[in-house]
Amino acid sequence: MKKLIFLFLITLSCSTSNNKNEGHANHAISDKNQNSLSPHTVAMAMVGGAHIHIDYSSPSVRNRIIFGGLLAYDEIWQSGAHNATWIETDYDLLVNGNKLKKGRYGFFTIPSRGDWTVIFNKNWEQHGKDEYDQKDDVLRFKVKPIILNDIVESLKYDIDEIDENNGLISLSWEKSKITIPFEIKR
């Protein structure tokens, strides 16, 4: 009888451990129940054991010109609506050849006709870009946007695992997409 109970407990333990990362697969959570034109949304994924979390509000195109229209070129944008978008990691990352220490950061961009500027800022808890200060930038670099054939109606972030040490963060909206490769630093 003891052996039977022991085998049952081992089987239960194994099935539970297989599901432990199930909730951390690349996914987005959106609060569609709220009455907002820009619902609060979250993108999360596990990449090589690191938990990457992006918190943002997701505005929609709604038949507007976004980049170079609603959002002027060459001006700071909180990369979402309402509060500044923030990104959190529980491991140090290597982003664009620079170390980004584990923690939570405000995420901003400067859209442009050419390369966009990507910014990780230590002030993550702010409304929009009102309190943005360049002196609080932890990391700033340029990326080349990808022009999409189809319109992405609602702002969307994705986090993809390339392999156990590398991942990719992407932001897509309207007809533009930027990608930010990163490496997990152990």
Predicted feature residues:
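Primarily secretory-pathway and cell-envelope proteins
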Residues: 15-75, 124-186
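Mid-length scaffold segments of soluble, non-membrane domains
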Residues: 76-127
